C-alpha cells in the first residue's frame, strides 16, 4: 500500500497523474511538466512536498550533537535562520543532504529526504550516546507546501502579513499565519527561484493549498508535480539524493563542498576523509554535459573518453528553459575541463557531448 499525503484527494480535482515515488503515491504532473516548469520560471507554482521528513532535535546538547553529525557549521545559526548541510559516513559518503532550522537555543528542526527518513532517524539515534537530546520524528504530523517562482511573494502577501513576505533567503518564522493557520514558513526552495516553504499541521494542508491557489490563480499560479520539481532543481544544479549524492558519492564530489566545513572545531563524522579529499582534490567531479549528437543523457548512462569509461550520468533531460539536451555527470576529475568532448552511451550508441559550465539556469537577482 502506497503512502499518501494529506493533500492526496485535492490532486484529483486537478487531474493529477500520480506515480510511486519511494513508496509514496505522488503527482508527477498536473497539466504537463513543461507547462509547470515554465510557470515556476516565469510566474509561480505550488508543490505538495509533504512526503519530506521532519525531525525535531531538542535538549541541552542539541548543538554539540548536530555539530558532530552534520558537515556544515551549525554554530553559525541564530534563531530564525536555516542552513543547508550534509550528513556523512566515516568514509565521507553521504547519509543525506538536509536543511537545519534553529527555532531557538537547543531547539532545531531537520528537514530530510523522504526516501531516507527511517535510515536518517536510525543514524541519529545510533549516535545519540550520552548526549542530552530528544530526537523526535514528526514527519507524519507535518505537511509541507512549496510556493515557488518570481511571483511567490506577490501571492503570499494576499494570505500572510508583511513579516512573512519580507523574510530574507534562508530565514524563517516558526510561528506565522498563512491563510489564518499557524505555520512555520521559510524563504527556501528547491527550484532555483524565489519562494517559500510552508510547514503546517497535516489537517490544515488542504485549507492552505486551496487558499493559495484561489488568490494565486489570477496571477498565473498552478499546481505542480514532481516532474517539474526535478527539471527545475536540475537546471539550478541542486542535487537529488540517490543521484548526485549517495553513500558512495561524497558532498565534495556531488558539488556541495560549500556545505562541508572541515575547518570547524567539532570533529564531525567523515571529517578526516573529507579533509583528505579536499586537500588532494576529489578523484571525481560533478560536471554539466551538453549533447552534440542527437539524444538525451539519462541517469546511469555511461560516459566515455575514447574506449575508457570515465563516469556516469546522474541526471539528464531536455532542459525546458535552455531547449537543449543536457545532463549532470560524475566523471574523473582529470577529464572535467570545460569544453572537453566525451561520449555518452545512449542505449547501443555512443553519442558526442561536451562538458559545459553549471548551473544551467541562474535567476537574475
From Swiss-Prot:
Its EC number is 2.1.2.10. It is an enzyme of class 2 (transferase). The keyword RNA-binding does not apply. Keywords: Aminotransferase, Transferase. Coiled coil: none annotated. One of its GO terms (molecular function) is transaminase activity. One of its GO terms (cellular component) is glycine cleavage complex. GO terms for biological process: glycine decarboxylation via glycine cleavage system. It catalyses: N(6)-[(R)-S(8)-aminomethyldihydrolipoyl]-L-lysyl-[protein] + (6S)-5,6,7,8-tetrahydrofolate = N(6)-[(R)-dihydrolipoyl]-L-lysyl-[protein] + (6R)-5,10-methylene-5,6,7,8-tetrahydrofolate + NH4(+). The glycine cleavage system is composed of four proteins: P, T, L and H. The glycine cleavage system catalyzes the degradation of glycine. PANTHER family: AMINOMETHYLTRANSFERASE (PTHR43757), AMINOMETHYLTRANSFERASE, MITOCHONDRIAL (PTHR43757:SF2). Belongs to the GcvT family. This is Aminomethyltransferase. It comes from Bacillus pumilus (strain SAFR-032). The lineage of its organism: Bacteria, Bacillati, Bacillota, Bacilli, Bacillales. The gene is gcvT.
Amino acid at each position: 500500500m502506497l503512502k499518501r499525503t494529506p493533500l492526496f484527494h485535492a490532486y484529483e480535482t486537478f487531474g493529477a497523474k500520480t506515480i510511486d515515488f519511494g513508496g509514496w503515491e505522488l503527482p508527477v504532473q498536473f497539466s504537463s511538466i513543461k507547462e509547470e516548469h515554465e510557470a515556476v520560471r516565469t510566474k509561480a507554482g505550488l508543490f505538495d512536498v509533504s512526503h519530506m521528513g521532519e525531525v525535531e532535535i531538542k535538549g541541552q546538547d542539541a548543538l554539540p550533537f548536530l555539530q558532530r553529525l552534520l558537515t556544515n557549521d551549525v554554530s553559525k545559526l541564530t534563531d530564525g535562520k536555516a542552513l543547508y548541510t550534509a550528513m556523512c559516513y566515516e568514509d565521507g559518503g553521504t547519509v543525506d543532504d538536509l536543511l537545519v532550522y534553529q527555532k531557538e537555543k537547543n531547539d532545531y528542526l531537520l528537514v530530510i529526504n523522504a526516501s531516507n527518513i527511517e535510515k536518517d532517524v536510525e543514524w541519529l539515534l545510533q549516535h545519540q550516546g550520552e548526549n542530552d537530546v530528544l530526537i523526535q520524528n514528526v514527519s507524519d504530523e507535518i505537511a509541507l507546501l512549496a510556493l515557488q517562482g518570481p511571483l511567490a511573494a506577490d501571492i503570499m502577501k494576499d494570505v500572510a502579513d508583511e513579516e512573512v513576505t519580507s523574510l530574507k533567503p534562508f530565514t524563517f518564522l516558526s510561528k506565522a499565519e498563512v491563510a489564518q493557520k499557524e505555520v512555520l514558513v521559510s524563504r527556501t526552495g528547491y527550484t532555483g527561484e524565489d519562494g517559500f516553504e510552508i510547514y503546517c499541521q497535516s489537517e490544515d494542508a488542504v485549507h492552505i493549498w486551496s487558499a493559495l491557489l484561489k488568490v494565486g490563480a489570477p496571477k498565473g499560479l498552478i499546481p505542480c508535480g514532481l516532474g517539474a520539481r526535478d527539471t527545475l532543481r536540475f537546471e539550478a544544479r541542486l542535487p537529488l539524493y540517490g543521484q548526485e549524492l549517495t553513500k558512495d558519492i561524497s558532498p565534495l564530489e556531488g558539488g556541495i563542498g560549500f556545505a562541508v566545513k572541515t575547518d570547524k572545531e567539532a570533529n564531525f563524522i567523515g571529517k578526516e576523509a573529507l579533509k583528505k579529499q579536499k586537500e588532494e582534490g576529489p578523484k571525481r567531479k560533478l560536471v554539466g554535459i551538453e549533447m552534440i549528437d542527437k539524444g538525451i543523457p539519462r541517469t546511469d548512462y555511461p560516459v566515455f573518453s575514447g574506449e575508457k569509461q570515465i563516469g556516469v550520468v546522474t541526471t539528464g533531460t531536455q532542459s525546458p528553459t535552455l531547449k537543449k539536451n543536457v545532463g549532470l555527470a560524475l566523471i574523473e576529475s582529470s577529464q572535467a575541463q570545460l569544453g572537453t568532448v566525451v561520449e555518452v552511451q545512449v542505449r547501443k550508441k555512443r553519442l558526442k557531448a561536451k562538458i559545459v559550465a553549471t548551473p544551467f539556469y541562474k535567476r537574475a537577482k
